[in-house]
Amino acid sequence: MAFRILAVGANREDMEKHVRFSSFLSKYSSITSSLLKLDSVLFPSVTRLELSKKDYDYMSISAVFEYGNKPCTYDHVVLATDSTFCRTGSDASPLLEKLHEALTPNGTIVIILPHSNPNENVVKKECMYTGFVELTFFEHNNFKWIVGKRPNWAPAQRSLTRGTLKVVSLDDYIPSAPAAESCDTKPRPCANCNCGRAERVNTDAKESTVNADGPTSSCGKCYLGDAFRCANCPYRGMPAFAPGDKIRLE
């Protein structure tokens, strides 16, 4: 099984000075012996590989930002740093994000810090923020080693906001104007009524006024009084009247 490995450092000579790639993943390498303790991080089958200079890609740190790597290209990334690497964390975050994108799911990153670099905790924190998991730290041959893995799942892309947010208008905070004074509690509308009661009373009066010529009698006894009127007689409740009189219903 062939694995693609990317080595990132100041220059190729320094990379091979720090790490002998011909034995980096060899079964009998002393470095590999330390890495074999991290079975949950590294592929066990990788330890059986014998690598030469042609078996890995090299790239300087500055070239990582210039070269557009295709996502999920490499199975392993080895990053060799100097004593000033990751002083604040923000200086290393863009580089770690690029390397995270270059790794395949379950791909491994190995960060090598010189013993004079005191920022291993900052590096581990930035690796965690970038998305690496199962981070492990150990020291070997006067170098500090940080090993992590890119998870085989993608971070959630769905927004945590459900639905749409209602935009509140400033008018909602302005109290409503007081209603016009009403005369509904009074026995009759005011002379200068402005609440609408006077208009309603006049309208109701017009609708309830009916000319006596309008209604017709089916029995012809309406003028005699309620005792002679039908149940649905329009004149019920009115006094008797002479036949032919004009009666106004209100």
Curated annotation (Swiss-Prot):
Motif stretch (Cx2C motif 1): 219-222
* Region described as Fe-S binding site A: spans on this chain: 183-195
Identify the main location: cytoplasm
> Is Mitochondrion among the key words of this record?
yes
* Swiss-Prot/TrEMBL cofactor(s): [2Fe-2S] cluster; [4Fe-4S] cluster
* Compartment(s) of residence: Cytoplasm; Mitochondrion intermembrane space
Provide the binding site for [4Fe-4S] cluster: C219, C222, C230, C233
Region span, Fe-S binding site B:
219-233
Q: Which residues bind [2Fe-2S] cluster?
A: C183, C190, C193, C195
Q: Where is this motif: Cx2C motif 2?
A: 230-233
What processes does the entry annotate via GO biological process terms? Answer: iron-sulfur cluster assembly
What Pfam families does the entry give? Answer: CIAPIN1 (PF05093)
GO MF term list: 2 iron, 2 sulfur cluster binding; 4 iron, 4 sulfur cluster binding; electron transfer activity; metal ion binding
List the residue ranges of the region (Linker): 154-180
- Renumbered residue ranges of the record's region N-terminal SAM-like domain: 1-154
Gene Ontology CC terms, in alphabetical order: mitochondrial intermembrane space
InterPro entries assigned to the protein according to its UniProt record, in alphabetical order: Anamorsin, CIAPIN1, SAM-dependent_MTases_sf
Q: Which UniProt keywords apply?
A: 2Fe-2S, 4Fe-4S, Cytoplasm, Iron, Iron-sulfur, Metal-binding, Mitochondrion
Domain description: The C-terminal domain binds 2 Fe-S clusters but is otherwise mostly in an intrinsically disordered conformation. The N-terminal domain has structural similarity with S-adenosyl-L-methionine-dependent methyltransferases, but does not bind S-adenosyl-L-methionine. It is required for correct assembly of the 2 Fe-S clusters.
What is this protein's function? Component of the cytosolic iron-sulfur (Fe-S) protein assembly (CIA) machinery. Required for the maturation of extramitochondrial Fe-S proteins. Part of an electron transfer chain functioning in an early step of cytosolic Fe-S biogenesis, facilitating the de novo assembly of a [4Fe-4S] cluster on the cytosolic Fe-S scaffold complex. Electrons are transferred from NADPH via a FAD- and FMN-containing diflavin oxidoreductase.
Q: Which family does it belong to?
A: Belongs to the anamorsin family.
Self-association and partners: Monomer.
* Protein name from the UniProt record: Anamorsin homolog
Species the sequence originates in: Babesia bovis
